[in-house]
């Protein structure tokens, strides 16, 4: 092997390493997204379990059970309007459609 072949081989190896590094970075970013989503889902699941346990312990249902249930869902940070039902509210910001539903008689 002469010097040019060695240099070319090292250059190819360097390019392969850069490509591999870019792939590893992409995988790390994807994994971070999956971890964040998993954390969010675990938190939501925990809140839902706590509310379910609380409802099981109370055992009674009032005549306004449906409205109370919607209020609890909204207070837990979820939409109750027909446009975004069940989706998490960003930073628990109020939704005018959800609030309108809660204020109906």
UniProtKB/Swiss-Prot annotation:
Keywords: Cytoplasm, DNA replication, DNA replication inhibitor, Metal-binding, Zinc. Zn(2+) binds at residues 79, 81, 95, 98. Its cofactor is Zn(2+). The keyword Cell membrane does not apply. It is found in: Cytoplasm, Nucleoid. It holds the Pfam family YabA. Disulfide bonds: none annotated. The keyword Isomerase does not apply. GO terms for cellular component: nucleoid. Binds 1 zinc ion per subunit. It comes from the Bacteria. Its main location: cytoplasm. One of its GO terms (biological process) is DNA replication. InterPro entries: YabA (IPR010377). Homotetramer. Interacts with both DnaA and DnaN, acting as a bridge between these two proteins. Belongs to the YabA family. Involved in control of chromosome replication initiation. Inhibits the cooperative binding of DnaA to the oriC region, thus negatively regulating initiation of chromosome replication. Inhibits the ability of DnaA-ATP to form a helix on DNA; does not disassemble preformed DnaA-DNA helices. Decreases the residence time of DnaA on the chromosome at its binding sites (oriC, replication forks and promoter-binding sites). Tethers DnaA to the replication machinery via the DNA polymerase beta sliding clamp subunit (dnaN). This is Replication initiation control protein YabA. It comes from Streptococcus suis (strain 05ZYH33). The lineage of its organism: Bacteria, Bacillati, Bacillota, Bacilli, Lactobacillales.
């Amino acid at each position: 092997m002469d010097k040019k072949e060695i240099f070319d081989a090292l250059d190819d190896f360097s390019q392969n390493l850069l490509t591999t590094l870019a792939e590893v970075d992409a995988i790390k970013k994807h994994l971070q997204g999956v971890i964040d989503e998993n954390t969010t889902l675990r938190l939501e699941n925990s809140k839902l379990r706590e509310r379910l346990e609380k409802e099981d312990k109370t055992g009674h249902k009032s005549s306004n059970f449906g409205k109370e249930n919607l209020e609890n869902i909204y207070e837990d940070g979820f939409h109750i309007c027909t446009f975004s039902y069940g989706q998490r509210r960003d930073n628990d910001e109020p939704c005018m459609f959800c609030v309108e539903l809660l204020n109906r008689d």
